[in-house]
Regions:
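Conserved glycine-rich cofactor-binding loop
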Residues: 7, 14-15
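Conserved Rossmann-fold SDR core element
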Residues: 25, 163, 173-187, 229-236
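Conserved glycine-rich Rossmann-like NAD(P)H-binding loop of the short-chain dehydrogenase/reductase
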Residues: 28-45
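Substrate-binding pocket helix/loop in short-chain dehydrogenase/reductase
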Residues: 98-99, 106-111, 137, 201
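Active-site helix of classical SDR
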Residues: 122, 158, 166
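Alpha-helical segment proximal to the catalytic Tyr-Lys
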Residues: 127, 170-175
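C-terminal substrate-recognition "lid" of short-chain dehydrogenase/reductases
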Residues: 212-236, 241
Length: 243
C-alpha cells in the first residue's frame, strides 16, 4: 500500500511510544491524526515536531473507553483529514493490580481501554478500508501475554485478548486489510513507574537491556511497508519470549 498522503490514526500519540510512532509515520509521508486523552500538552508537542505541523496533521481528544467517543473521534478525523488508511492501536494503561486487592473499577478500566477500545476502533475504520480495497491495522500487544506478570493480571489478560482479536480481525478483514500486532518487551518505561524494578525483565532477556522507542518504530515501519504479512504478532522484546 502506498503511504504517501494517506491518513493514519495513532491513539495515545501525545506521549512516549505513540509520539515516536506519529513522528515516523509523518516522515513516511503520511498525514497523522494524533489522538490523546489527558496529554494535550504532549499532543501539541507531537504535532509541532511533524513536517507541516497543524496545517497537515490533526490533534483530537477522546476517551476511548466510551464507544460513542470512538465513533465521534473517527468521524471527525475522516471529515477533517480524509479516509483513515492506517490505524495504530497504541493507547493503553498499565499499573500494578495485586490479585487480592484489584477492584472491579480497575479491571473494567484496563479491559475497556486495552481491549474494548481497539475492537471498536477497528470496527469503525475497517468497513471503509475494505470498501476502498486497502488498509492496515497494528495493535500494540505485550510480551507478557505468554508469561503473565502475577501483579498485573488484568493488564496481561487485556493484552492476551488483544492478541486473539488481532488474529481474528486479520481473518475477518482479509484480503483487503492487513492486521498485525507488535509485542514489546520492557520498552520506554513511563516516568511514574521509575520506582518499579524492571531488572528481572532485563535479566530474563537475551539482549540484556530495556528497549527504545526506535526499536518499536522500526517494527511499525516494517509492518506498514510489507504487503504480505497479516495475522502476525511480532515480538520486539530483546529475546525475552525465548529466554
Amino acid at each position: 500500500m502506498e503511504l504517501q498522503d494517506k491518513v493514519a490514526l495513532v491513539t495515545g500519540a501525545g506521549v512516549r511510544l505513540g509520539q515516536a510512532i506519529a513522528q515516523q509515520l509523518a516522515q513516511l509521508g503520511m498525514r497523522v491524526v494524533i489522538h490523546y486523552h489527558h496529554s494535550e500538552k504532549g499532543a501539541k508537542q507531537t504535532v509541532q515536531g511533524l513536517p507541516g505541523g497543524e496545517s497537515r496533521h490533526l490533534i483530537l481528544q477522546a476517551d476511548l473507553k466510551e464507544v460513542s467517543s470512538i465513533k465521534e473521534l473517527v468521524g471527525t478525523a475522516e471529515e477533517k483529514s480524509g479516509p483513515i488508511s492506517v490505524l495504530i492501536n497504541n493507547a493503553a494503561d498499565f499499573f500494578p493490580t495485586p490479585l487480592f486487592s484489584t477492584t472491579e473499577e480497575e479491571w473494567d478500566h484496563l479491559l475497556a481501554l486495552n481491549l474494548k477500545a481497539p475492537f471498536f476502533l477497528a470496527q469503525t475504520v475497517a468497513e471503509g478500508m475494505k470498501s476502498r480495497g486497502e488498509g492496515k491495522i497494528i495493535n500494540m500487544v505485550d510480551s507478557s501475554t505468554e508469561r503473565p506478570w502475577v501483579s498485573f493480571l488484568p493488564y496481561c489478560t487485556s493484552k492476551a485478548g488483544l492478541v486473539s482479536l488481532t488474529k481474528g480481525l486479520a481473518r475477518a478483514l482479509s484480503p483487503e486489510v492487513q492486521v498485525n500486532g507488535i509485542a514489546p518487551g520492557t520498552v520506554l518505561t513511563p516516568p511514574d513507574h521509575a520506582k518499579m524494578n524492571f531488572s528481572s525483565s532485563v535479566e530474563h532477556s537475551l539482549l540484556k537491556r530495556i528497549g527504545s522507542a526506535e526499536d518499536i518504530v522500526q517494527a511499525v515501519e516494517y509492518l506498514l511497508l510489507s504487503d504480505f504479512v497479516t495475522g502476525t504478532i511480532l515480538p520486539v522484546d530483546g529475546g525475552r519470549s525465548v529466554y
